[in-house]
Amino acid sequence: MDLLLVIKAIIMGIVEGITELLPISSTGHLILAADVMNFLSHDKRVVFEIFIQMGAMLAIVWEYRVKIFSSLAGAVRPGIERNLFINVAIAFFPAALVGFLFSDFIRTVLFSPYVVAGGFIVGGVIIMWVEKYAYAPRLDDMDRISYADAFNVGLCQCLALIPGTSRSGATIIGGMYFGLSRRASTEFSFFLAIPMIGAASLYALWEAREQMEIEDMGILAIGFITSFFVTFAVMRALLRFVSKHTYMAFAWYRIAFGLLVLATAYTGVINWSV
């Protein structure tokens, strides 16, 4: 196996692991990293990105395996465990439905560098606004989120279908806007990542099944494992961070990255097509 390709795969796994759960959009960063490193052909990169996203998802599953098992086991009887299971299902449904109905439109019409840049910049401004004017937490326990709160966060997650918006950004800031504490909305966002990434990955994997080749399994495994461990570390670090800090730094970063997308798209330095 080519050593340079291995290094590139590790870097891509690191990028995915860092950006998947932070409110900064993993997609834009993966496109940038892949273009700068000239990483794989388009078709092979699609498959690789599916695998590193699954690595990120499984890191969440492993971290919360006890709570997930309790939630699944308690789904048939009243209690906090069933409440979490139902809330995740409620929040998952709106984005799943909209994504299923409009997936072709999103890929063919919305995925332009200018939409991506707009998603980054507008998302950054919204984070600033919520942090400064709309954050009034009334609930600090993810297990006690109401069905209405879950549905509202699910509606916010629909905005993440706009490229550059960020799934985690939409759900975290949406949760904060509707009265969840930073930690509660961040943890709930982690849980929502499981069905969203899982469903999207399985669908994308089925569509890309003809591009999968046995000789690529080594590089796919490297990306998967790297993403798993980096996501695991970032997940814990983010929860420690939000217990003491706001999301304002991420807002400024989003705006700066959005301007970078605009500049590189206008000059043609980076190919932002997918």
UniProtKB/Swiss-Prot annotation:
Membrane topology, from the record: Multi-pass membrane protein
Stretches that traverse the bilayer: 4-24, 46-66, 86-106, 109-129, 145-165, 188-208, 214-234, 250-270
Gene Ontology CC annotations of this record: plasma membrane
GO biological process: cell wall organization; peptidoglycan biosynthetic process; regulation of cell shape; response to antibiotic
Reactions mediated catalytically: di-trans,octa-cis-undecaprenyl diphosphate + H2O = di-trans,octa-cis-undecaprenyl phosphate + phosphate + H(+)
Enzyme Commission number: 3.6.1.27
Coiled coil stretches, renumbered: none
One example GO MF annotation: undecaprenyl-diphosphatase activity
Further comment: Bacitracin is thought to be involved in the inhibition of peptidoglycan synthesis by sequestering undecaprenyl diphosphate, thereby reducing the pool of lipid carrier available.
Role summary: Catalyzes the dephosphorylation of undecaprenyl diphosphate (UPP). Confers resistance to bacitracin.
Family under the similarity heading: Belongs to the UppP family.
Record's protein name: Undecaprenyl-diphosphatase
Organism: Cellvibrio japonicus (strain Ueda107)
Classification lineage: Bacteria, Pseudomonadati, Pseudomonadota, Gammaproteobacteria, Cellvibrionales
